[in-house]
A protein has these predicted regions:
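Aromatic/glycine/proline-enriched transmembrane-helix motif characteristic
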Residues: 1-171
């Protein structure tokens, strides 16, 4: 698999100057906002926001909450060389891909035993992570326990001669 490097540059820019993406579908409960502010206060920025150039300025793809939490700060931004359609795909998949990761309970237990925080919201996040109860932190949406596989009943998988998979609605 050939992977393209789409990062044009790393810029430092005032967070309030970044344009929020009007298609951003993620919402951020108060518990998440508080925990992020706590981590930023204790550690600072250790990861870049993601944006693309538009005629109106840099539009966010990833990092909306960090930008909102620190509007007066100069923040690191990875500027990507992607078009609007590619940005939409990233916006739709970036967080869900991360949330698909599993848990190694032994390693998580060891890690949590070794970390401390002076921030109440961060400590509550760590407790919830330890209890595997992030949903108990507050107003997170209830996604349910199981995937309803019935939603795929009308979808047909087609494999073309080159081996690519395509999905279409059954006729």
């Amino acid at each position: 698999m050939k992977v393209r490097d789409r990062i044009k540059e790393l810029r430092r820019i005032r967070a309030s100057e970044l344009l929020p993406n009007p298609k951003n579908w993620r919402t951020h409960p108060v518990a998440q906002q508080d925990a992020l502010k706590g981590v930023l206060a204790e550690i600072g920025y250790a990861d870049a926001l993601i944006a693309r150039e538009t005629p109106d300025g840099l539009m966010l793809i990833g990092g909306h909450l960090r930008a909102e939490a620190t509007p007066d700060s100069e923040v690191p931004v990875l500027v990507l060389d992607i078009n609007e359609e590619e940005a939409d795909l990233m916006l739709a998949t970036l967080d869900p891909l991360a949330s698909m990761a599993g848990r190694d309970e032994g390693l998580l237990t060891q890690l949590l035993a070794s970390v401390t925080s002076e921030n109440d919201a961060v400590n509550e996040l760590l407790r919830a992570l330890s209890d595997n109860d992030l949903g108990g932190l507050g107003d997170f949406p209830d996604w349910g326990d199981e995937l309803d596989e019935g939603i795929a009943d009308d979808i047909q998988l087609c494999i073309c001669k080159c081996g690519h998979e395509h999905h279409k609605v059954k006729e």
